[in-house]
């Protein structure tokens, strides 16, 4: 039996060559944030069988960027200016990994966000990022 996907999550709405190997990804869209989640599997791990820090950092960056886009009404594009991640635990194959975001401040040229990354509800990392707001390409 496959573990269920938590309530409110649906197949992720955006595909990317970077995240294709990590599929299936799921997202939950709220009024001012986007959470990303996935069931941890072998391709998500390092040589010790634990979740890879690069996966955590990349998903946090994506989720915080989407959250800023959501807060700004999806009318602009964003590029990451800075990203910091503190690793405080680890995740294992089979656990549900979820990136929960909060947009701290939006402006005409910058957006700031933070996130907690949890494996089965236990915090394994925290991250924060700054994004440059740019005109969306038509």
Regions picked out by a protein language model, each given a short descriptive name:
Residues 1-138:
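Terminal targeting signals and extreme-terminal segments of soluble enzymes
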């Amino acid at each position: 039996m496959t573990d269920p996907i938590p309530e409110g999550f649906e197949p992720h709405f955006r595909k990317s060559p970077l995240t294709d190997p990590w599929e299936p990804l799921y997202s939950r869209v709220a009024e001012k944030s986007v959470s990303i989640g996935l069931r941890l599997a072998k391709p998500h791990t390092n040589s010790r069988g634990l979740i890879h820090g690069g996966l955590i950092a990349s998903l946090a960056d994506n989720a915080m960027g989407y959250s800023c886009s959501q807060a700004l009404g999806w009318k602009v594009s964003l590029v990451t200016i800075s990203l910091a991640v503190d690793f405080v635990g680890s995740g294992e194959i089979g656990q549900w990994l979820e990136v929960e975001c909060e947009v701290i401040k939006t402006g005409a040229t910058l957006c700031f966000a933070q996130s907690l990354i949890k494996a089965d509800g236990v915090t394994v990392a925290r991250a924060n990022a700054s994004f440059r707001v740019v005109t969306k390409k038509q």
